């Protein structure tokens, strides 16, 4: 992000911390402002999976998301498949680390409520805080209903 001159702040924490909820506590931010990145596949799979960024306090509704994306059916990728598709470890999957790799990135629409969001920097133990507008600009993400 330095290369792209995007203002941001990096948070480092113990890599054993796995949940976005725990990260929210450590960063002193509400869980709604901390985004988790989920790998979601069409069912049956076709092409690259979706990277779905959403507030950590929310649970995904695959039927709602499928309708938002114009898909008949979606499924969560397994941890193994998520790591295979992204070459990143679960807990460190980040759209920011996968720029220009052909993934379709979507952000759950409630994240628009916040000026700044925190998300994985692409490695366990590192998160990055940036303006929501910069995240959308960098990733080309579109806002969708997913809950």
Question: Where are the regions that the model predicts?
Answer:
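Extended, low-hydrophobicity, polar/charged segments
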Residues: 2-147
């Amino acid at each position: 992000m330095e290369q792209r001159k995007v203002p941001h702040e990096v948070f480092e924490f113990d890599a054993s911390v796995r949940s976005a909820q725990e990260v929210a506590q450590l960063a002193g931010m509400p869980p709604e402002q901390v985004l988790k990145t989920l790998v979601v596949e069409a069912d049956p799979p076709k092409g690259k999976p979706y990277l779905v960024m959403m507030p950590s306090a929310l649970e995904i509704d695959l039927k709602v998301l499928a309708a938002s994306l114009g898909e008949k059916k979606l499924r969560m990728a397994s941890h193994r498949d998520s790591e295979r598709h992204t070459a990143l470890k679960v807990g460190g999957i980040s759209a920011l680390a996968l720029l220009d790799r052909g993934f379709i990135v979507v952000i759950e629409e409630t994240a628009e409520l916040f000026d700044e969001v925190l998300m994985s920097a692409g490695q366990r133990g590192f998160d990055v805080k940036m303006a929501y507008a910069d995240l959308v600009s960098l990733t080309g993400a579109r806002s969708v209903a997913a809950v």
